[in-house]
Amino acid sequence: MTIWFLIGFLLPVAIFAAPPPINRLALFPDKSAWCEAKNITQIVGHSGCESKSIQNRACLGQCFSYSVPNTFPQSTESLVHCDSCMPIDSVWDVVTLECPGNEEFPRVDKLVEKILQCSCQACGKELSQEGAMFNVYLNTAEDSPAESLGHHQHRPPAREDDSPAQSHREGESEE
């Protein structure tokens, strides 16, 4: 039974797992890959709203990629490798922007990825933004991410003269 588990589950995982990052190449032994999180000031904005400056980090570095010419018929597996400097640890924060003059949506919440740590990772390994937003919404018990892809808009408190249909549409967003 254990052998079937190893063959059926672990073998495909091992085959399709991304290769580890490469730190040095034989052709350039004096060069090494590097990737680090650099402090930046990020401007968060939204149409019709006041922008906000926040402190964040950006991933910056030089990671190795290479492609060795192929042969036909192919005698060995393709020799292509790609690493990119990208986040390995981040959190998502809500940044609230004020939107003066917009009575319907006086504030807009933007989800902003705050990068904590970076490293050379296999290209195409980016974490899905929708998946990350889904986790944020699950953790904060707010509206679902499908209702506001990328930001959540706040309406002002309902006035007494508002009809129930108007205040019920709070989760709808206008793009």
UniProtKB/Swiss-Prot annotation:
Primary location recorded for the protein, binned into one broad class: secreted
Location of the region described as Disordered in the Swiss-Prot/TrEMBL record: 144-175
Functional description taken from the UniProt entry: May act as a tumor suppressor. Cytokine that has an axial patterning activity. Acts like bone morpho-genetic protein (BMP) antagonist in embryonic explants. Blocks the bmp2 activity.
Protein known as: Neuroblastoma suppressor of tumorigenicity 1
Record's signal peptide: 1-17
Gene label: nbl1
Subcellular location: Secreted
UniProt family annotation: Belongs to the DAN family.
Organism ancestry: Eukaryota, Metazoa, Chordata, Craniata, Vertebrata
GO biological process, one term: sequestering of BMP from receptor via BMP binding
Basic and acidic residues bias spans: 157-175
Quaternary organization: Interacts with bmp2; the interaction is blocked in presence of nog.
GO terms for cellular component: extracellular space
Protein's UniProt keywords contain Cytoplasm: no
Boundaries of every CTCK domain copy: 35-124
SMART domains according to UniProt: CT
Keyword Signal belongs to the record: yes
UniProt entry keywords in alphabetical sequence: Cytokine, Disulfide bond, Secreted, Signal, Tumor suppressor
Protein species of origin: Xenopus laevis (African clawed frog)
Disulfide pattern: 35-85, 49-99, 59-118, 63-120, 82-123
Pfam families: DAN
Database matches in Gene3D superfamilies: Cystine-knot cytokines
Entry's Gene Ontology molecular function annotations: BMP binding; cytokine activity; receptor ligand activity
